[in-house]
């Protein structure tokens, strides 16, 4: 068990205690070098593992193979964690003691409060902030992909309109064609967020489903969250998915991919598009059941009830990497204020 933080410790040791706790939450077994056994569980995190560049703060093993390193820093280092990325890379490229050298693809820098992550297999690797460390099975999957990462696949998605047809010939409106092409360009540039702004009645949901179809078709088996703020919006989205037929396939979207409105306290296996209210997602992240009437309450009324931001902790059954893409319908009502932490 991880020892509680004691505040007379050195600040970096305090950070390591928090990191230990977060690793354990994510399914890692913590070990010292003295008791090193990389086959003890699927995911093993070894403290102070020796390399020819000095001990690395944590070396992470998946199924007995080294896959990641963590460079730990004290909490007040959070705003300048990017300055230690070179140090992390040096440790990852160093010769490891006791075992044959392996290519370390995954790098973390963490204060325990702020954590940054780099996948060196990406086409243009760069660090990004993450909520927690990834689970062992996640790193195992990503390691098996090698250079064929999600971001590599996003860059390789073919053009929607290589023959420069009119939008009508593609079964789209001009604004829909522009939105889909711009979204694809944004994802290819590795921009993590994008905003689609369209007039009322312009077909935003149809546009979103068109983008989802292309993401699922060209990036493989993925999970998409379609987040709404009312039950009615979720049901409307489901109905549009039921009748949506892509221009390059005669089958309906829901014949190709499993899309469901989430109505239970868990997400069923095999669902590729999860349609969910932000209220239910909050209950899923809390690991709690919710009363159905609560889901029909408008966000504004929830905010009047709650008054302060909703706390969200790590949920092992629904880790941050569970979804590959998140679409937020009517996002101006949910991405700020009390619901921001849920996202």
Predicted segment positions?
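Walker B catalytic acidic pair
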Residues: 277, 329-330
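Post-DEXD/H (motif II) to motif III coupling segment of the RecA-like Helicase ATP-binding lobe
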Residues: 335-343
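Hydrophobic transmembrane alpha-helical segments of multi-pass transport and channel proteins
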Residues: 220, 330-334
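Short, well-structured beta-strand/strand-turn elements
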Residues: 29-34, 249-259, 332
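Conserved helicase motor
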Residues: 231, 253-264, 278-283
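ATP-dependent helicase/translocase motor core
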Residues: 1-223, 228-248, 269-273, 279, ...
């Amino acid at each position: 068990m991880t020892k509680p933080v004691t505040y007379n410790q050195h600040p970096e040791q305090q950070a390591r205690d928090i990191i230990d706790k977060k690793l354990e939450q994510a399914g890692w077994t913590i070990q010292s070098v003295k008791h090193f056994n990389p086959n003890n569980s699927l995911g093993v995190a070894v403290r102070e593992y020796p390399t020819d560049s000095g001990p690395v703060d944590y070396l992470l093993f998946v199924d007995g193979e080294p896959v990641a390193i963590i460079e730990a820093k004290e909490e007040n280092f959070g705003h300048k964690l990017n300055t230690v990325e070179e140090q992390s890379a040096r440790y990852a490229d160093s010769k490891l003691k006791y075992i044959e050298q392996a290519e370390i693809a995954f790098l973390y820098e963490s204060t325990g409060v702020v954590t940054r992550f780099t996948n060196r297999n990406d086409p243009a690797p760069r660090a990004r902030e993450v909520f927690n460390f990834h689970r062992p099975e996640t790193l195992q999957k990503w390691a098996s992909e090698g250079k064929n990462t999600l971001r590599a696949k996003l860059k390789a998605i073919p053009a929607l309109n290589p023959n420069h047809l009119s939008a009508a010939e593609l079964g789209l409106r001009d604004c829909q064609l522009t939105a889909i092409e711009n979204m694809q360009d944004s994802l290819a540039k590795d921009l993590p967020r994008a905003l689609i702004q369209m007039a009322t009645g312009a077909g935003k949901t149809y546009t979103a489903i068109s983008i989802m179809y292309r993401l699922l078709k060209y990036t493989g088996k993925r999970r998409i969250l379609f987040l709404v703020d009312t039950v009615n919006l979720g049901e409307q989205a489901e109905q549009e998915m039921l009748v949506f037929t892509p221009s390059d396939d005669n089958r309906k979207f829901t014949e190709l991919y499993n899309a469901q409105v989430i109505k239970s306290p868990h997400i069923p296996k095999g669902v590729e598009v999860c349609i969910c209210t932000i209220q239910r997602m909050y209950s899923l992240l809390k690991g709690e059941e919710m009363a159905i009437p609560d889901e029909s309450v408008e966000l504004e009324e929830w905010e009047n009830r709650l008054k302060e931001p909703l706390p969200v902790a790590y949920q092992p059954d629904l880790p941050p990497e569970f979804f590959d893409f998140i679409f937020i319908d009517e996002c101006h009502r949910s991405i700020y204020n009390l619901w921001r932490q849920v996202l």
